[in-house]
């Protein structure tokens, strides 16, 4: 190739190279320390479970499981509807310890730090529990029920409450560092990127809040009541709303990038999204799992289940793992959306999968926690 031709080829290829976006953050292969796996709530695991899932063990919590499991250091942590937070051996399912909150536990899912595991209950109490023996370290009382899941950012733990506040607490002592009042219940889990927490709220506002001091940096009017948690990746936010739509926002320009709203099926999106390979994947109450182009919002594929999908998908090993209220955990090919396998739990799956060390852990509406691999 002549020098001039080679230079021209380099110039033509350069924009394509620089336009490539870094891959979304993924949870480590051996851990899933919080709801959605990472503080930015990407829903991606570096682990690769087998495509054909078999039951390795089960554990009966005795009540409905809406809480999604966390996995750290070979231990599974999950909350049950009866108010118990349990720690189980990942390999065997054997009970390590049980902590009783004294209230019911709903959708709040545990977050695991170095010394403590954190969870909220429906009585509005936020708990820090010794990760090794299940003893109480401290509690913090909010003004209403907690369905939001905690996120640990250095020495601060974040959690939302139905009292309309997002709280920043000292992770070691439970002391209040700050709180931010919104105009509605804080149901969703905050997503964190570069020291800023983002909450998509029941007041139709996407708020950016500095983690160190709780200062609101800016807000964007999403125009819709939101129960799903936002996914943040490379200064973009993705989330579904109760206005039967999925939205993407450019956080630098603070404007909407695209809106996806199926014309033939008007149902809310309660599931939180996962992102990999240029696609945003989430479940809908229209009984479908949707995969959208991250740049345009155009559908890449949909997959029909037999009931609404409130469970949030996890992407691992080129596959999508997601539960449905029809009682099945589906394994789908990430590129095509074709079903690879399914596991029938026999009861609705509204909790989300946790994936680590080649295992998939999910709880069902009849109180059974499954470890599959």
PLM region spans:
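Beta-propeller domains
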Residues: 80-90
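Positively charged n-region of N-terminal signal peptides that target proteins for export
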Residues: 1-4
């Amino acid at each position: 190739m002549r020098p001039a031709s080679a230079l021209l080829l380099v110039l033509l290829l350069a924009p394509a190279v620089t336009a490539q976006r870094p891959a979304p953050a993924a949870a480590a292969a051996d851990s899933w320390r919080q709801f959605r796996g990472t503080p930015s709530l990407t829903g991606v695991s570096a682990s690769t479970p087998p495509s054909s899932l078999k039951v390795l063990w089960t554990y009966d919590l005795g009540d409905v499981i809406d809480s999604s499991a966390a996995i750290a250091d070979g231990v599974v942590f999950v909350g049950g509807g009866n108010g118990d937070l349990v720690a189980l051996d990942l390999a065997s399912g054997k009970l390590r310890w049980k902590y009783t909150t004294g209230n019911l536990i709903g959708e709040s899912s545990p977050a695991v730090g170095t010394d403590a595991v954190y969870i909220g209950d429906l009585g509005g109490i936020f708990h820090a529990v010794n990760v090794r023996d299940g003893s109480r370290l401290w509690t913090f009382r909010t003004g209403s029920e907690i369905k939001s899941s905690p996120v640990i950012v250095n020495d601060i733990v974040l959690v939302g409450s139905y009292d309309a506040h997002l709280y920043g607490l000292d992770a070691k002592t439970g002391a209040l560092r700050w709180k931010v009042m919104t105009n509605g219940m804080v149901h969703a889990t905050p997503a964190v990127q570069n020291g800023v927490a983002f909450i998509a709220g029941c007041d139709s506002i996407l708020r950016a809040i500095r983690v160190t001091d709780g200062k609101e940096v800016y807000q964007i009017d999403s125009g819709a009541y939101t129960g799903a948690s936002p996914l943040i990746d490379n200064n973009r936010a993705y989330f579904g709303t109760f206005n039967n739509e999925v939205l993407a926002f450019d956080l630098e320009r603070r404007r909407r990038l695209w809106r996806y709203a199926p014309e033939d099926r008007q149902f809310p999106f309660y599931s939180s999204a996962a992102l990999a390979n240029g696609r945003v994947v989430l479940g809908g109450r229209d009984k479908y799992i949707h995969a959208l182009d991250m740049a345009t919002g155009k559908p890449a594929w949909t997959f029909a289940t037999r009931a609404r999908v409130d469970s949030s998908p996890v992407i691992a090993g080129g596959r999508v793992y997601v539960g449905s209220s029809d009682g099945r955990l589906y394994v789908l090919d990430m590129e095509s959306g074709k079903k690879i396998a399914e596991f029938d739990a026999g009861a609705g799956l509204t909790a989300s999968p946790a994936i680590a060390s080649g295992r998939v852990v999910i709880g069902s509406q009849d109180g059974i926690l499954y470890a599959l691999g």
